[in-house]
Amino acid sequence: MANILLVEDDSDVQTIVSEFLATLGHRVTSASSAEQARCFLASEPVDLALVDCLMEGEQGSSLAEHACKLGIPTILTSGDPHYIETCSEHPFPFLPKPFRLSRLDELIASTLHKSKTD
């Protein structure tokens, strides 16, 4: 399974998603800010990043671009209607909140598969 960096500032969402991904066999590292995520990206093996678009400080799309430069596939998420439109314009897979955990699982699998075939 994959090493996933979950970047989410809502602690409830972070807990639910992290626990779900762990039950699927993924190793999950959680960060509540882009700054914290950048530290993990520099020091931890990451196969995929799951990033909330709207966070305090640096926006998720900027962090996604940084992860992309490191060769790490990234999925963006958001529940804010304005950011749903903005983030869906980026070249990264996008998952609007609220989402079904089964849809998250499918998107992670397809994103990881695509990154291995590119």
Descriptions of predicted regions:
Residues 52:
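Active-site residues of response regulator receiver
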Residues 55:
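Receiver (REC) domain active-site loop signature in two-component systems and cognate sites
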Residues 11-29:
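Two-component/phosphorelay signaling modules centered on CheY-like receiver
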Residues 30-48:
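Acidic, metal-coordinating helix/loop segments flanking the phosphotransfer/catalytic sites
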Residues 99-111, 116:
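C-terminal output helix
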Residues 8:
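Conserved acidic carboxylate
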Residues 33, 58-62:
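Acidic catalytic/metal-coordinating carboxylates
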Residues 75-78:
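Hydrophobic/aromatic residues positioned on beta-strands within the core alpha/beta folds
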